Amino acid sequence: MKCCLKWFGIIFIFVTLIASIYVYNKTDGFSVKKIKVFYLQLTQNPWQEQYAYALGKGALPYLFPYFYSAQIRWKWTNVIPKDPASEPYAPINHFWHANRLVDHHYQGGGTPSNDTIYSTAWVHVDKEPVILSHPDMGERYFSFHFTKATSDILDVVSSQSTGKNAGHFALVPQGFNGELPKGVKALKTAQGSWYLLLARTMVKDKDDLKAVKLLQQQYLLTPLSYWGQPQENLPKSREMWQPFDAKEDPLAHWKTINKALAEDPPQNYEKSLMNLLADLHIGPNQNIDTLDKNSKLGLARAMEDGLKMMLMARASIPGGNVINGWRRNPTNAGSLGAAGDYFTRGVIQSFKGISPSIKTEGKYFGRSVDERGEPLHGSNSYQLTFKAGEEPPVNAFWSLTLYGMDTNLVGNNINRYSIGDRSQGLKYKDDGSLTIYIQHESPGSEKEANWLPAPNDNFSLTFRAYGPKPELFEGQWVVPQLSND
């Protein structure tokens, strides 16, 4: 068994080093001097430091979601934000609600949606079930994603999966043998004690915000022991452990990972990997302080260089396949861990997205270049045309959103940040086709209803399909190529 684990470790390290080389080559490039420095680091340091460095850096993409989730959980529950209207802040098992659609005034990046308004909550299910309740949503699209510490999705409550009628849904901890109240449906059994609950609620336009806010106020989280009691009786605790401070301890992030792993232990099929990492005292209930000095030095370097590697990878490896110039998010987004794709899970799904949308709820496509591979620029005139009968196959709606290269929305004279099938006054041609015009200058009054304003600068586009039909998320339907006249 130990022999197999050692070979597994060698292969794991080798694959990660190849990935590191790929990312490094895509960003900084190579030189003889850099190769010599790398070689000297390998040959002059004690073997314990080399081993800890290689294994620690190689394992970081797998372990990163645990660290990142713990950081975000603390921030969103215990750090008072500068702008409470756009930054989450709420007690445990309570919702925070955004109260406005994101526009160009928000400069936090991350390609924010201008179609839906967000609600978030950190759900703790260590002792008893917690019940999610929502009102009748009418014909409005909505979704609640229960996100694990790994950034994979445990379960979803949505207009697509559970229906638009009012409902109650219980997140149940492992080992619970009690009964749920009448009318409460059990979701998949929780695999850990903490979940990020992210809700997306469709907003037609600014005039629709009042109706959405009324719905949001009826999104409730109730621990089973408080079921039937007034909401004001619910505890508003923010008590949890704080991630270790890297300014005080070079091994702080590894200690945060160990504590997070103790709360949400890895799956049984990951035991071989955890047995390997146990050599470095990484894992549930492990103590890095008892590690030898050289291994500690290796882990400290591994965290520093590993985070740099992941930052470079996040910027240069968007993930997904490219068809007609559009790069789509991975088909198995939300379950990358179960698929064994830990690198993409750590770099893209967790580090870049926090809480992904599963394929049956939302499918995203992005691009920043034209059909010739040249960067998109507002001085050019682009058209996206859907032929008659070939509009996006969705059960909910679709949209096209424009972002600056800083991944923020871009201000414009008509305050239009996205365009789609909910946009008022879209004009179809006589043959039934629909063309969207993307450029800096107005395409003319007769085409302005179909105009998505662009800056006089480089930009990127994101196409979103909410409630996609199988032909879309399975790849039979693809977003048309962008033309440049």
Residue ranges and their predicted role:
Residues 23-485:
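A compositional/structural signature for long, glycine/proline-rich flexible linkers
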